[in-house]
Amino acid sequence: MSVSITPLEDRIVVKPLDAEQTTASGLVIPDTAKEKPQEGEVLAVGPGRVDDNGNRVPVDVAVGDKVIYSKYGGTEVKYGGDELLILSARDVLAKVAK
């Protein structure tokens, strides 16, 4: 998916992965009981923040990376029919190996 959103500073655009639809035992989880996803794919990355010395600090993730992020970090937005999340790179906790 190509996104025409360009995040500013150290922000990234993430498409959250779908939450589990069923439990391990096969029970269907209703939408109201689902946990917020904490894993997603990076769709766009900002240029990085500027530190106190005026140097640009690059972001540690790249487009296409799978990441785990803070449960309540970022701002949810709808764009082009998709639910996306714009969050600071500081809210990213880890990259998931492919």
Curated annotation (Swiss-Prot):
One of its GO terms (biological process) is chaperone cofactor-dependent protein refolding. Pfam families: Cpn10 (PF00166). Belongs to the GroES chaperonin family. It comes from the Bacteria. It comes from Kineococcus radiotolerans (strain ATCC BAA-149 / DSM 14245 / SRS30216). Heptamer of 7 subunits arranged in a ring. Interacts with the chaperonin GroEL. NCBIfam families: PRK00364.1-2 (NF001527), PRK00364.1-6 (NF001530), PRK00364.2-2 (NF001531), PRK00364.2-4 (NF001533), PRK00364.2-5 (NF001534). GO terms for molecular function: ATP binding; metal ion binding; protein folding chaperone; protein-folding chaperone binding; unfolded protein binding. Keywords: Chaperone, Cytoplasm. This is Co-chaperonin GroES. GO terms for cellular component: cytoplasm.
